[in-house]
Amino acid sequence: MTQNHDPYSDAQALVGLTLGKATDYQAEYDASLLQGVPRSLNRNAIALTGTLPFHGADIWTGYELSWLNAKGKPMVAIAEFHLSYESLNLIESKSFKLYLNSFNQTKFDSIDSLQKTLVADLSQCAQGDISVKIIEPKSFGIQRIIELPGTCIDDLDIEVSDYSFNPDYLENSTDDKQTVAETLNSNLLKSNCLITSQPDWGSVMIRYQGPKIDREKLLRYLISFRQHNEFHEQCVERIFVDLKRFCHCTKLTVYARYTRRGGLDINPYRSDFEQPGESHRLARQ
């Protein structure tokens, strides 16, 4: 089994996070609540230095956005955030929740003013580009629930006894005599929060071109995240790197959609050949 040094065990960037600590909820706008985590913590550990082998975004959905209009009347909306993969930091989710809660008793003259505030604060925290889409209640009716595209591999009748993360499940997992272009998905992705060890439930889509991947070995690999502690974004980048390394995919997209916590869901998207389409939630989100 591959043994990896824990890149987070002595990471000073994690010491000051509010995650896992008792906190007070602020009802007045406070941008200082936002906390970033350097992406380099994970990327250095999986040899992602220099030019990255993918592009993409961390796609967040905020379901509990509320503020006051100029007359003091409460307003609500859903917000969709696209944070560039190139940002220096990812945004820590609990701090994001606390930050959004701080809008609850804060007046904004317009949705445009609210949107500009969100973009300015989040881009400053992440040290990168972010776009923000505000979905008003009049558009709630067109919000869709979908299934991930591709063939689901969860019905494979396998016996599992080891739930420790192990990329070696992908060793010798391809048939070099068959080159395919296919899309697979699984709803069995589960990892744990890096700080609190709370379960993070997700679904993942893998679209690739290259030697055909043994689906049973791929499923065992995905299941091995079950007791693995890492942030959502880091898990997706780890999956991408492992598939490139072991399966020699010539084209690859890894897209995970995690269930929401604190009114937020996180949906990391990484690809070396395509861009994310429209973001639609899954049934568990």
UniProtKB/Swiss-Prot annotation:
EC numbers on record:
1.7.1.13
**Would I find Cytoplasm among this entry's keywords?**
yes
Give the subcellular location: Cytoplasm
Reaction equation(s) it catalyzes:
7-aminomethyl-7-carbaguanine + 2 NADP(+) = 7-cyano-7-deazaguanine + 2 NADPH + 3 H(+)
Positions annotated to bind substrate: I91, E92, S93, H232, E233
Q: Which residues does the Swiss-Prot or TrEMBL record annotate as the active site?
A: C193, D200
Q: Mind listing the UniProt keywords for this protein, alphabetically?
A: Cytoplasm, NADP, Oxidoreductase, Queuosine biosynthesis
Pfam families in the cross-refs: QueF, QueF_N
GO process terms (BP): queuosine biosynthetic process; tRNA modification
What pathway is this protein a component of? tRNA modification; tRNA-queuosine biosynthesis
Q: Which residues bind NADPH?
A: S93, K94, R261, G262
The Swiss-Prot or TrEMBL record describes its family as follows: Belongs to the GTP cyclohydrolase I family. QueF type 2 subfamily.
Q: Subunit notes for this chain?
A: Homodimer.
Q: What is this protein called?
A: NADPH-dependent 7-cyano-7-deazaguanine reductase
Q: Taxonomy-wise, where does this protein's organism fall, top ranks first?
A: Bacteria, Pseudomonadati, Pseudomonadota, Gammaproteobacteria, Alteromonadales
